[in-house]
C-alpha cells in the first residue's frame, strides 16, 4: 500500500472506530483500533500477540467502564450505548468526529511521515509522550501484550515491511475467460475466514468492497450490474459469482453493452488463508489488454491496475471491520 493510501485509510478507519463506539472524539485507542481495522502488517503483528480487532474493541469497552467505576459511576447494561451497526455507519458516512488534542498532536507531528502500518504502531507505543498510563499501552497491557517485547519486535521490521507488490505476469490459467494478464496482492485482515467468505460471496454487499455505491444499477441473485461512466460512453458490467467455497470466492465481470458486449473484462479470485488472529486474503486479478493498443500501453499503465488491487483489499478490510 502506498504511503498516502495507508495514511488516508488509517484516518478513515480510526474515525469509523470512534463512531462505532459512539465516542465524541478520536482518541489514541481509536488510532490503534484503526490499524487493526485497516489490516496489513501491524494488524498481523498484533494478532500474533493475541490482539484481534474484536478483542481490542472489547478491551476499550472494559477499560471505559472500569474508569467510570473508579470514580463511582456504574452504568447498568440497559443504559450502555450499543455499538453502531455497519448499516448505520454507511448511512452516516460523511460526518466526521473531531480528533482529541492528543490524537491531533500525534497526527500533526508524525502522521504523514509514517509510511507503513508497522511504523504507525511503533510510533503509537514508542512516542516520547507514551507512559505506562497511556491509553494505547494500557489497552495492549489489558490484552496481555508484553509491550516492551512488542517495541523490540517492531524496531526490527524494515520500513518497507508491507507485502511486496509484484509485477504483472502472463497467464493461461484464466484463458477460458479470454484473459491474459494477472496481478496479485495479499493482505492480512483481522477477521475469520468464515466471516470473510460470507461477506465476499454476498451480492448485496458488493458495494462494501467491489462496486462504488453510486455505480450500482441492480443486484441479482448471483451478482450485480455496474454502470461505469467514461468520457465518451457509458459501459455496463455484469458481475457474476463463479466460485463460493470456504477458502475461495471468485467473481467474473462481463461487459454487457457496446462493441465489447459479452467479453469478460476481468476476474477477481479471492483466496482465504487462515492465519493467527485472522486471515490472509490473496487477491488475484486476471484481466485483458483490449487489443493491440492495450498491449502496447500495458507496460506503462499496469501500475495503476495494481493500485486498484490495493484499494480493493483495503475495502475488504474496512467492510469486515464494519461487519463485525
PLM-predicted stretches and their roles:
Residues 1-190:
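Histone-fold recognition with a strong bias for associated Lys/Arg-rich disordered tails
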Residues 190-211:
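Amphipathic alpha-helical segments
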Residues 228-237, 241, 266-270, 275, ...:
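Long, compositionally biased intrinsically disordered regions
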Residues 257-307:
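Beta-strand/loop substructures that line and gate deep hydrophobic ligand-binding cavities in soluble
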Residues 297-324:
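A conserved amphipathic terminal alpha-helix motif
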Residues 207-208, 217-263, 323:
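Glycine-rich portal/gate segments that line the openings of hydrophobic small-molecule binding cavities
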Residues 196-197, 206, 224, 283, ...:
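Hydrophobic pocket/interface hotspot
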Residues 181-183, 211-214:
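A short, amphipathic edge element
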Amino acid at each position: 500500500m502506498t504511503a498516502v493510501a495507508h495514511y488516508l485509510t488509517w484516518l478513515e478507519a480510526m474515525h469509523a472506530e470512534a463512531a462505532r463506539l459512539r465516542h465524541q472524539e478520536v482518541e489514541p485507542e481509536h488510532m490503534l483500533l484503526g490499524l487493526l481495522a485497516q489490516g496489513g502488517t501491524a494488524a498481523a503483528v498484533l494478532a500474533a500477540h493475541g490482539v484481534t480487532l474484536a478483542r481490542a474493541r472489547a478491551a476499550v469497552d472494559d477499560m471505559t467502564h472500569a474508569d467510570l467505576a473508579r470514580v463511582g459511576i456504574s452504568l447498568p447494561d440497559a443504559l450502555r450505548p450499543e455499538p453502531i451497526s455497519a448499516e448505520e455507519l454507511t448511512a452516516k458516512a460523511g460526518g466526521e468526529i473531531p480528533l482529541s488534542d492528543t490524537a491531533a498532536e500525534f497526527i500533526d507531528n508524525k502522521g504523514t511521515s509514517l509510511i507503513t502500518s508497522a511504523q504507525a504502531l511503533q510510533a503509537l507505543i514508542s512516542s516520547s509522550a507514551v507512559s505506562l498510563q497511556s491509553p494505547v499501552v494500557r489497552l495492549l497491557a489489558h490484552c496481555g501484550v508484553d509491550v516492551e517485547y512488542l517495541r523490540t519486535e517492531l524496531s526490527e521490521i524494515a520500513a518497507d515491511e508491507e507485502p511486496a507488490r509484484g509485477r504483472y505476469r502472463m497467464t493461461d490459467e484464466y484463458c477460458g475467460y479470454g484473459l491474459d494478464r494477472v496481478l496479485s496482492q495479499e493482505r492480512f485482515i483481522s477477521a475469520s475466514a468464515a466471516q470473510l467468505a460470507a461477506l465476499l460471496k454476498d451480492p448485496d454487499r458488493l458495494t462494501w468492497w467491489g462496486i462504488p455505491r453510486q455505480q450500482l444499477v441492480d443486484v441479482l441473485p448471483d451478482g450485480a450490474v455496474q454502470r461505469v461512466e467514461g468520457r465518451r460512453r457509458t459501459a455496463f458490467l455484469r458481475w457474476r459469482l463463479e466460485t463460493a467455497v470456504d477458502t475461495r470466492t471468485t467473481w467474473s465481470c462481463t461487459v454487457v453493452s457496446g462493441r465489447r458486449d459479452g467479453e469478460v473484462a476481468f476476474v477477481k479470485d479471492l483466496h482465504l488463508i487462515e492465519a493467527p488472529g485472522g486471515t490472509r486474503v490473496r487477491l488475484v486479478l486476471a484481466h485483458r489488454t483490449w487489443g493491440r493498443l492495450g498491449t502496447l500501453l500495458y507496460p506503462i499503465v499496469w501500475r495503476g491496475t495494481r493500485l486498484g488491487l490495493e484499494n480493493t483489499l483495503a475495502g475488504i478490510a474496512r467492510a469486515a471491520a464494519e461487519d463485525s
